[in-house]
Amino acid sequence: MNSRTPMLLLAAALALGACKPAEDPQVAIAAKAAADEKAAEAMAQSFEAAVALNKWDVARAHGDVLTAQYPNSKAAARIKAQYEVAKVEAVKALEARRLAALWSYQTEPVISGGEQRSAALYAKDHIDTDGGGAHEVRLIFRDHPAWGRSSYLVLQAGDFDCYGGCKVKLKVDDAAPKPVAASRPKTDEATAMFIEDERMLWRTVRGAKTIAIEFPVKAGGTRTAVFEVGGLDASRLPGWK
């Protein structure tokens, strides 16, 4: 073969390539748009599946990505109304989980037989109950096989000024405070003050978002503990009605 033949073939190939028409930019744009729409549609379907299952936080995550990456897609336009709903519901779901996590539940065996069940949560803010600084205040509902049902506050420091009975003020959400009977038993086992009408308090908590209890302390005056009660799982204390 002539030594010049490969060079001639290469030159011919290059010439043919040079003669090939350039790719239409509109075709490339259309291809990318189609690919983007396909990807957006897949995200929209994931979004709609999460909405159908009421998984609002998952739905919002899909909607966030879809509207950020493909804001002008048909899929984004289709889910727009549902996406706005998902954003609101996701915030509600997050708040519901936060409120539920404030409560703690215990079930303990009792030596004499049966089980003691309790539901408890701490006040929203620490309170100075003894003049020595802010401390925790806890609200507890207890169901004991021998002692029955009771509701009470427990102080981490200081003491209640309610020996022999007193009136505390109970405020429910935005309603005006009302007096309720309470008592501090003569015991050193725990610094506890019982709300006498535990059934009333339980029913109040079940239907409230926030309650505030103003109580007298030995350090002087009164203190107010605010409890975010909206996340109570009433099924954890099945004996309470």
Give, region by region, the residue ranges found by the protein language model:
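C-terminal motif of bacterial Sec signal peptides marking the signal peptidase cleavage site
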Residues: 15-18
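Bacterial N-terminal signal peptides that target proteins for export
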Residues: 1-9
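A generic "folded-domain core" signal
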Residues: 20-68, 74-241
